[in-house]
Amino acid sequence: MTGNGSGSKTVVLKIPRSFLRYYRLSSDVVQVQGPEDATILDLIRMAELPEVEFGIAAINGEREYLSYTPKDGQVIELHPILMGG
């Protein structure tokens, strides 16, 4: 997974499997290519995922803001916003 050399990058977005019953996706892993300066939120939008569903991102077990700019080849775990009642 490497960018194409023209200022782009490719990352993998990993979404919770439970979302597959609500959204028509072929897999819980989505590979997306975007510009080098794309944030996690930008990449979620480029992958046409429902951005309002995800509020937490993790890379290598470390939490990152959706405004974080991931590096080429990184795997980003997306998690829903936790709500209590």
Residue ranges and their predicted role:
Residues 1-84:
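Ubiquitin-like/PB1-type beta-grasp interaction modules and other compact soluble beta-rich domains
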